């Protein structure tokens, strides 16, 4: 009867009803006796109610007996208030915890004495701690729900205590809050939750790490109140309310030592002092700590603003591999200090020991520090969320994410169970075999051995992933023989070593090494950089020895060192990443142009570290997103242009490096070059429009468009392509003057605007120029206005344009314009290209143009792949000729891209299949080789003087067995193309 009455009102949401298989009993008889012995001492109705719940739910009964056996702390909470236990067991834990917090807030809001608040918060803590522990032990909540509940409890406790203290201060007239019920709002007092509390990951018996800041001009302070003494006193009161131990316990231990320079600063710091400290003295561990920082109490708006100001300290603009060694040093020091240098079971510290929680956190945080500046999506607080994003962005493998996530959840569960024993902030397992046997049962295992097997498996997997990141001897120095690399050319041991590595000129290499090791170059004058470089040299020499021409590779790296103005980051990057060093060695050996770019701007190397580097080439949407991140916080027009230039140079460098490494087809690279240019053009168009309008206003109904011609229009760009552009505009005739302070008439307005636009591209800053711009393809060329109104452009194309201008128009593509204006321009272009034409006249004009080009540029150089007889110009002219002649009857032939136009012509039966089978492979061959030559050669290409690295890359790009075979194929191809050109269009050889 009692049993049914007690359990009848329970539904399946009640905590008691939701217990699953949990702990096991080490000594079932003794545990049952201990539990029953306590029940005997209770009032009969309480004992009957608790016993009935245990009988109804056997898993709950075992869990309660396990607590009596293994956890003095939880058993004390149970024995201290049996009614509290019944409340917790009968209610749904989610609703019960919410009600506990709500009731506590109501009580504290009405309290007038600090003692009342302290008592209320301790009652809250006791019941919430019991509820959360039971949800953990019974498997009712997953681990991260447990940590979030603990975090919410801590956060709300801090908020209640702080609000009470500020309410008291308001009553004393020391602050004048606009909202007396929420005196913290607008107070300028900021409480940051750090570490696990900041990330929603608080453990069961954790301290709470807080940093308290205040604004010097705190708006709610009374005029005669000094900020520092006031906020220090409030902070001390907050700490006292939460952590003072009394007969009814404590709420949370408070640790304020994560603030700047805690040994010499007060417990509350001004935001001005904090920002100055982080800018001048902030260390890597403080950057790592700030990843998880979160405003948890006080003025939350001011807290968010402060974190935004601190963000540049935490998130460096460029990849920061120096953080690797800093973080690893921190971890090593902790392990050494705590004697946790090996994996174990008995006594092992699951937090800071080998393979522990801290290694998982550091694994994630270090990579967040390295890349979070460039990739804002990595700026997340929770560890598991960071692992998820790192895997999604290919910074880590899916296997690493899964194994580290599983280990983290397991170790956090172990950590909680250890702390539940005595409510101690310990992370160490019991240190005897018998104690581990007992603990294993409390955790749900049937033996010490089964627990140890799982524990060691998780620890070893974590250590393996951590070691790959931190301890893999990234420089490779540990495996190399102990040679004095600075000994110079007289040291026979060094010379023998260099010969054994494959260097053919050891005397020269030894001399160069001596210069490096003595710090003779500008970049090596900084002691820390010089020391890092000396440690890196052995691995560098070994890696450069793998090049096709090792001696040339050393010379190329030497040129890079001499050209560097600052190189600490570059040396750090290369020393931590052997694959990157291999790639840079290839760049230096084959493409001096890219090497020079790297010397001027070492930060462009960052993109090579991005896991996406070897993936699919980014499309326009992804490029736009990256560009937006690059420009997000530019503070001025000049900084905006500098960042655009850096983005453009880095993109060129990355695409070029992929071409050299053979990891992207050259046609894709051509499109990628064009996509980068198009994104930059659109961005500059918008920026200049806004800047220009701020001075000159706007013309009513104005619209501007940028028309891409040439290689940008056809999306066939190379690393050295300039931009062929035409600016087209329109406006309402009834109001032709702009409405700005300095008004301009229509045509003058757009001419001046176009000049400003060109200047944005071509002005040289510290980061060089964006692009060279060529506007000679506009109507009337240099003789015409720099910008064309749409009706004038249409009239010119219809009535005055030469055949060569219509040939060029086949590549015209609107790349930046409002949609409606874009459509109008495209209609004009299509109308021009699809009008009827006389094939004989067009053929004659094209042949004449080709002869003129040959006379001006020459056509006898086989390696002038553009202008040689049978070169790319011949193929372009064939594709353009076919479009002009046939577009009237077959408009589907039209395409801005040469290969696509040839495909269309073949599909429509306008180009013979046999001719297409010559022209298409020829175009691809020329484009493949041209991409390489534009990257690697500034002047004309001469095979006799070209380096072996370049020739090797060209042979690979041309899919030939060797260079002589490649050259023979080029000559044969040119002969075949010229024959088709003469047959289709006519020429001197026809």
Curated annotation (Swiss-Prot):
Which keywords are on file for this protein?
ATP-binding, Magnesium, Multifunctional enzyme, Nucleotide-binding, Nucleotidyltransferase, Transferase
Q: Which GO terms describe its cellular component?
A: cytosol
Which cofactor is essential here? Mg(2+)
Cited InterPro entries: GlnE, GlnE_rpt_dom, NT_sf, PII_UdlTrfase/GS_AdlTrfase
What Gene3D superfamilies does its record include?
1.20.120.1510, Beta Polymerase, domain 2, Nucleotidyltransferases domain 2
Q: What class of enzyme is it?
A: transferase
Catalytic reaction equation(s): [glutamine synthetase]-O(4)-(5'-adenylyl)-L-tyrosine + phosphate = [glutamine synthetase]-L-tyrosine + ADP; [glutamine synthetase]-L-tyrosine + ATP = [glutamine synthetase]-O(4)-(5'-adenylyl)-L-tyrosine + diphosphate
Biological process, per Gene Ontology: regulation of glutamine family amino acid metabolic process
Its Enzyme Commission number(s) read: 2.7.7.89, 2.7.7.42
| Region (Adenylyl transferase), start-end ranges | 478-990
Q: Which family does it belong to?
A: Belongs to the GlnE family.
Please state what the protein is called. Bifunctional glutamine synthetase adenylyltransferase/adenylyl-removing enzyme
Per the UniProt record, the source organism is Rhodopseudomonas palustris (strain TIE-1)
